[in-house]
Amino acid sequence: MATRFNLPPLFLALLLLLLSAAAAGTAPPTCSRIECPSYDVVDQGNGFEIRRYISPLWISTSSIDDISLVNATRQGFLLLFDYIQGKNEYGETIEMTAPVITQVSPSDGPFCASSFVVSFYVPKQNQGKPPPADGLSVQKWGVSYAAVRQFAGFVSDYGVAEEAAALYSSLEGSAWFDAVEKQDPTSVYTVAQYNSPFEFTDRVNEIWLILSVEGNSL
């Protein structure tokens, strides 16, 4: 005969709250201060979570060739910062958002330049008609799935490669590994940075692997 447990209502309410928080995932603290793209967490595993992004819009640089992700991101960010400060065809200033992402297509060798595209998330109020600007273009993602790994501190070229490898390894044997294998080969991984260079504590960065999910049916 099964034993029945009578749990206090307060305990049940707390349990439900904890479960709902786990399902929602841990959003970077920056997103409580400035706008970030919205997403749902559809799965979590050891060292990763799977997010579904709801059609985010980005303003992006052209491809930047460099041997350093850090240098390329700095170069791209300066262009994007000028853009949001009004250096666009409308002379329009735009609110800062997070994250700034760098899509990485690694080179074939350690001394060859990789290709980087740096992007700024366009706030919802500007998505209807984002201002054009020379050298920048709009990327509109459909509903997109990403495997995500968070890490702290300042981004470094060597550290990013290690974090990307760790995310890839954590997905092996999971139901999502095949979707990683089918991803867009022109963007092997994406680095998302949420903090200003002048913030020295509580820094949050992420590695994203964009997944090829047929029909976005999940």
Task: Pin down the residues of each PLM region.
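A solvent-exposed interaction/effector surface
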Residues: 2-218
